[in-house]
Amino acid sequence: RSEDGGTKIYGASGRVKRPGLWELPMGTTIREIIDEHALGMQDGYCFRGVIPGGASTDFLVAEHLDTPMDFGSVTRAGSRLGTGTMIVLDDRTCPVGMVHNLEKFFARESCGWCTPCRDCLPWTAATLEALEDGRGEEGDLEILESHCWMMSPGHTFCALAPGAAEPLGSALKYF
């Protein structure tokens, strides 16, 4: 079933009928976790995407629902397994607002030691807030993309900024 053996604690939060944690075989698919263990999306909501491994992992979308939740499969799909606690995004929640919340969290948690965290994260959060409120400006998306590059591995002292860049970059790609 999976290239990784044993079991793992998986979780699902968001507009699912039964948010929670479950110990399941490694490699259980995203679809099975959402549909069978979290009992699907709440009435009136449809699946839009998922952050499969916690706040610092890339979004996956409907084409990835049959991805086994193991290290190799999730990596090949374009994200990371991380904690295995999925944040499920529905079709009525604004992806910009969701990513804005995540970037505010990362900006608040930054120690401020390196430039990408100290400068990019607060600016990124403010730009996402402006976009969400309809105050975006031409060129904002390109600047956000450049911030993803500046916050990528090799440009920072620790993994905080690269973790913040993952959901931002994938949201720019998918939404």
Identify what each model region corresponds to.
Residues 1-175:
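Redox cofactor-anchoring modules in respiratory/redox and cofactor-processing assemblies
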